[in-house]
């Protein structure tokens, strides 16, 4: 069977295509390596019709990076190791009062290391990390904010937090605003940690941004091999039957053959 060339990104990976030939049935999957073509920030913020700066052309670049991390085992392993080595085992200090604080830094009973580890994970994954600080009488609580939910305001003075930018991208009532330090409002402020990146004034970029295609290929190779093992139709011989056969009969024959040759333990059988 002839292998089909890769199609454009307009086709989804799960789509199947059948040829119109009457006596033969061909099926193949199309892979979608949907790497963002350009990762830029708007040069003229006056042209941006929202109060925040979009991150990526579709404002979903952080979501893409998070999904890529879940799909590529190599990428996930590298980022996890960097996070573990950065966060260490624990924070230690001599001051007894400070020692008690770092064991419990917020109302969720998280330690300073718990929060710091999440910040390090976001920093390495997205090139950005956000820590929310909530002041109260006698101290301050520290919280990690999921970087995929945050967009920076045009003014650079606050952030917008949205649990679903894909669904509620234009509904401000679904968002919360938190000022960026040193501004404080309602006893809250956020500290934005980010990588420096030329031409980027609002967001940082992760170190691996130049390797996005290679990371995607790592995932696609694994998916290709897995699909091949499950659905590979490679008998050790080809049997040709002379005579006319209708489309329905041909399809039935293909189905019966696939039951025998497709699946675990059936490769190379005849």
Region annotations inferred by a language model:
Residues 2-270:
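Structured, contiguous alpha/beta core segments that scaffold functional sites
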């Amino acid at each position: 069977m002839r292998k089909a060339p890769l199609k454009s990104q307009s086709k989804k990976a799960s789509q199947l295509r059948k040829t119109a030939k009457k006596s033969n049935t061909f099926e193949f999957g199309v892979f979608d390596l949907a790497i963002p073509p350009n990762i830029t920030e708007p040069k003229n913020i006056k042209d941006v019709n929202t109060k925040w700066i979009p991150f990526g052309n579709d404002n979903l670049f952080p979501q893409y990076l998070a999904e890529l991390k879940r799909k590529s085992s190599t990428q996930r392993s590298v980022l996890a190791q960097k996070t573990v080595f950065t966060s260490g085992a624990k924070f230690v200090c001599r001051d007894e009062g400070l020692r008690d604080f770092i064991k419990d830094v917020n109302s969720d009973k998280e330690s300073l290391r718990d929060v710091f580890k999440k910040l390090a994970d976001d920093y390495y994954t997205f090139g950005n990390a956000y820590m929310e600080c909530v002041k109260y009488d006698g101290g301050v609580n520290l919280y990690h904010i999921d970087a995929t939910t945050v967009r920076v305001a045009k003014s650079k003075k606050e952030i917008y937090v949205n649990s679903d930018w894909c669904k509620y991208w234009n509904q401000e009532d679904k968002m919360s605003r938190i000022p960026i330090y040193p501004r404080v409002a309602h006893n809250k402020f956020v500290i934005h940690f980010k990588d420096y990146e030329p031409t980027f004034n609002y967001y940082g970029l992760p170190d691996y941004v130049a390797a996005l295609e290679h990371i995607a290929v790592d995932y696609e190779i694994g998916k290709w091999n897995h699909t091949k093992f499950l659905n590979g139709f490679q008998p050790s011989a080809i049997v040709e039957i002379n005579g006319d056969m209708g489309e329905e009969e041909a399809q039935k024959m293909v189905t019966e053959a696939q039951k025998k040759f497709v699946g675990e333990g059936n490769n190379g059988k005849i």
